[in-house]
């Protein structure tokens, strides 16, 4: 038994597992708020290096009881590229998010001017912390995902061990079952109201 190697391969499998979770979609426990003070004449700003994506962004003006957050429209690269004057300054109304290999940036349009103080307020998806060395530390997952973590790790390790290849299918099924349970519970709860739309037609007699 190669104890040292087993520890390293388990750590790598765990890191790959959490990366897979990020690719599967939104994990509520990774949503983090943040703000960036905007500078007049500067259009592009870098987000924290562990940012996966932005899910909400707004332009904040004022402070205290006079603070106002205005929604910023997220636009695509094609929409941003069609702006005829990308250096036009004014009150930002749109944001173009670039998810690069080493960082995530947001480019605002119009470029912030100096007529008032602007703050970029956002909610981002934070990357799940990986395990680098050793076996100490706290797992960056909530308790409701622990069964999924355990079954997923067992499945990932089994794929590397020929002697247990006959159990891979069963372990994958258990992992998918546990993930569906956890992901189904890890959803946002909010009130919603449906109002029927009625149209009346009248005809002359």
Residue ranges and their predicted role:
Residues 1-205:
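Glycine-enriched, solvent-exposed interface loops adjoining structured elements
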């Amino acid at each position: 038994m190669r104890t040292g190697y087993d520890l390293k391969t388990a750590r790598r499998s765990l890191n790959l597992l959490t990366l897979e979770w990020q690719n599967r979609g939104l994990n509520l426990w990774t949503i983090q708020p943040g703000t960036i003070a905007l500078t007049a004449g500067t259009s592009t700003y870098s987000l924290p290096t562990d940012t996966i994506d932005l899910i909400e962004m707004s332009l904040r003006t004022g402070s205290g009881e006079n603070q106002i957050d205005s929604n910023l429209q997220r636009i695509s690269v094609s929409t941003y590229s069609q702006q005829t004057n990308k250096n036009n300054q004014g009150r930002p109304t749109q944001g173009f998010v670039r998810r690069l290999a080493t960082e995530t940036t947001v480019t605002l349009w119009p470029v912030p001017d100096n007529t008032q103080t602007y703050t970029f307020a956002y909610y981002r998806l934070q990357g799940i912390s990986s395990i680098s060395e050793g076996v100490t530390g706290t797992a960056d997952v909530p308790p409701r995902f622990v069964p999924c973590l355990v079954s997923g790790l067992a499945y990932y390790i089994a794929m590397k061990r020929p002697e247990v290849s006959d159990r891979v299918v069963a372990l994958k099924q258990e992992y998918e079952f546990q993930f569906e349970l956890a992901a189904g519970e890890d959803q946002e709860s909010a009130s919603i109201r449906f109002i029927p739309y009625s149209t009346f037609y009248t005809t002359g007699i």
